[in-house]
Structure formats: C-alpha cells, structure tokens
Amino acid sequence: MLKSSNINSVLNELPNDPARDSTAQSSHNGKPKQDAETCCSSQDNEVMASLAALQLSAGVLQIAEPPLNHVRTQLRELIGRQNKTYIDLSKEKYKLDCSEVARLNDMMSDVKRYKDKLTKIKKEMQGVYQRTKELKKRAANVAACKQRDYQRKLERLQHEESLIGSQ
C-alpha cells in the first residue's frame, strides 16, 4: 500500500513544471483554476501511477530478491556438485574401460596360448596314434612270427618223434 507521506515527499521533489506554475497563477483568476486543476490532477495521477508502479516493483524485488539470491547460490552449488560428480564418474568409467581393455587383452593372450597348447596336444595325439598303429602292426607281425615259429617247432617235434618212433 502506498503511504500518503511517501507520495507527498516524491511529489514535492518533482521539478516544478510550467504547467503547475500556470495552475498556481490561474487559481487567482477563478474559472481557469478549475481547468488547470483537472489538467494537473491527470498529470498528478499519471505520476502517482508510475510512482506506484515503481514502488510496487521495488517492494516485489525487495521481497523476492533474497530468496532468489539464496536459490541462485544453491543452484550454483548444485551445478558444481553435479560437475564434480560427472567428472568423477567419467574418471571411473575411463578406469573401467581401461581395465576392460586390459582384461580383454589378457583374455585374448590366454586364448592364443591355449590354442597353441591345443594344437601341440593335437599333434602329439596324432603322433601317439601313428605310433600305436605301427606298434599294433608290429605286434601282429611278431605274433604271426611266433605262431609260425611255434608251428615249426611243433612240426619239428612231431617229425623227431616220428623219426624216434620209427626206429
């Protein structure tokens, strides 16, 4: 609300207009005083309206500015914390990415090493298979030779017995 003392003090501080001076002079004449008063009163109303608007906006600013400043500082702090958190998360992501890359490289080297071991074992298994195949063949030949030797020995024994028996 506007206080009349404030309006009067502001109006008293306004520079004297020639229109106001003429109203003061015309007030001595009679009728022109009434026209001058209506003219001045409309100007006074405009000045009062603009003054009221200024005082209203100043009052609103006075009321709203401290909370807005407080909110502004809190917002700055929040943005600062968000930036710090974002930077920390970015660093952690980079560390994880680096560790993932390192782990992937380790895994790939393990895969290569195990593949080499597997091919080596496969070659050894093929070599063992070939040797067992040859050994089986030799064993079959040896068994066949022993069988023939045994048959010859039996035949010789039978032949000797037949020679001894015929005497």
Curated annotation (Swiss-Prot):
The keyword Cytoplasm applies. Its main location: other. The keyword Isomerase does not apply. Residues 102-160 form a coiled coil. Pfam families: Snapin_Pallidin (PF14712). Keywords: Coiled coil, Cytoplasm, Cytoskeleton, Synapse. Disruption phenotype: Viable and fertile. In the neuromuscular junctions, results in abnormal tubular endosomal compartments and a reduction in early endosomes which leads to a decrease recycling and recovery of the synaptic vesicle pool and results in failure to sustain neurotransmitter release during high-frequency stimulation. Does not affect synaptic morphology or basal function. One of its GO terms (biological process) is eye pigment granule organization. Residues 1-11 have a biased composition (Polar residues). One of its GO terms (cellular component) is BLOC-1 complex. Residues 1-38 are annotated as: Disordered. It is found in: Synapse; Cytoplasm, Cytoskeleton; Cytoplasm, Myofibril, Sarcomere, Z line. Component of the biogenesis of lysosome-related organelles complex-1 (BLOC-1) involved in pigment granule biogenesis and membrane trafficking in synapses. In response to high synaptic activity at neuromuscular junctions, plays a key role in promoting efficient synaptic vesicle recycling and re-formation through early endosomes. Belongs to the BLOC1S6 family. Component of the biogenesis of lysosome-related organelles complex-1 (BLOC-1) composed of Blos1, Blos2, Blos3, Blos4, Dysb, Muted, Pldn and Snapin. Interacts with Blos1, Blos4 and Dysb. This is Biogenesis of lysosome-related organelles complex 1 subunit 6. It comes from Drosophila melanogaster (Fruit fly).
